[in-house]
Amino acid sequence: MTNSRQPAFNPGELNVYSTPRDVTNVSSALRHTGRRVMLVPTMGALHNGHLALVRAAKRVPGSVVVVSIFVNPLQFGAAEDLDTYPCTFDDDLALLRAEDVEIVFTPTAAAMYPHGLRTTVRPGALAFELEGGPRPNHFDGVLTVVLKLLQIVRPDRVFFGEKDYQQLVLIRQMVADLNVDVVVVGVPTVREVDGLAMSSRNCYLDPVQRDLAAALSAALTAGAHAATGGAQAALDAARAVLDATPGLVVDYVELRDAGLGPMRDNTFGRLLVAARLGATRLLDNISIEIGNFSGIASPDECRVEHAQTPWMK
């Protein structure tokens, strides 16, 4: 026997659901009326970077935007900040209401994993490089929760920021390899005035660390402009900026191709950096072209508004 209860949905208002079945039923009903469902997965503590994803989703004609807020325990390691991750739920809802978001999904861990870790997604080799080096199970947790959200919401499009570029690439791999019927949209990184990539974890930085954190974007810019001299010149220029920053502990500076495979000369690539200031770990990346006059592959890299017409149709 099926459950005939249909959850309430008020068009033009912010509707908050905590039960996966409710979101699935509402999404299905909306699709049957011709609405196009867009998903923006988040862990809350929203900032302008998240809002750029929402705005990109809302630009799709006929869209209804679903924002999920779920701090996923599967993607945190034993010594990481699961218990202290920023929680600003009321403020998050106010921001989303101001953006005219119609659906927010706020499940509990028990609702998302009612049977524990009985079934999970196991990614390929890329998940154990870069961010996966010190965090070997991180992307298992990321891909598992993303796949579950896609199954629950059944969106036409799902939106992720390019700041977590490795995550974006791995999600695209999963969607392709598992034949998931969704378009994955990457939205350019949104930055503070001094270039620091927006992140919910930036609130952990004290004032001195906050000033020093701008070195990551400065390093990427230096690398991009040095790329006319080749891949090694780009890496050396980025590393020089980071090494000159007191208190900054660099985990890696790497140049990869757009799919995060090995980089080759005279091609587009991604310059990625991870570093720590105190207990706070920071990530950033930029698209560059080796041998290009400016070295910067995308002139819209740092812009909040970014047109991606193929997925907007």
From Swiss-Prot:
GO terms for biological process: pantothenate biosynthetic process. Homodimer. It catalyses: (R)-pantoate + beta-alanine + ATP = (R)-pantothenate + AMP + diphosphate + H(+). SUPFAM superfamilies: Nucleotidylyl transferase (SSF52374). This is Pantothenate synthetase. Pathway: Cofactor biosynthesis; (R)-pantothenate biosynthesis; (R)-pantothenate from (R)-pantoate and beta-alanine: step 1/1. Belongs to the pantothenate synthetase family. Catalyzes the condensation of pantoate with beta-alanine in an ATP-dependent reaction via a pantoyl-adenylate intermediate. The reaction proceeds by a bi uni uni bi ping pong mechanism. Its EC number is 6.3.2.1.
